[in-house]
């Protein structure tokens, strides 16, 4: 997998605000853990399954119509990538993503600055 290409496609998907394009990078059994979940819901900090993630990200895109990410750097590991980027609410973010055998993200952990 070309990690830099993945990173650019991922950023462009988010900046397009096209939910289906965003979700195309993720496995059906995706598990995401991020403190932003509590910002946009009253639930847990982890969501499981593409449908739960679709609902959450759909609401988030509605609440942040001017969402625009700027990629700063990309690092990689074994079947994984970490993206460092400018996120929403003037925060910098690092997302660590782990890929399944099909090259889809199966697990993601997000970290943000204050």
What are these regions (language model features)?
Residues 1-29:
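Short acidic-aromatic low-complexity motifs
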Residues 1-5, 15-16, 46-48, 75, ...:
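Alpha-helical interaction segments
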Residues 6, 18, 56-57, 93:
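Hydrophobic alpha-helical segments typical of transmembrane helices
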Residues 10, 22-23, 30, 49, ...:
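Hydrophobic pocket/interface hotspot
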Residues 13, 27, 32, 46, ...:
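Secondary-structure boundary/capping motif
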Residues 27-72:
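A solvent-exposed, acidic/Ser-Thr-rich amphipathic alpha-helical stretch
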Residues 58-114:
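A beta-strand edge to alpha-helix "cap/lid" segment located at domain peripheries
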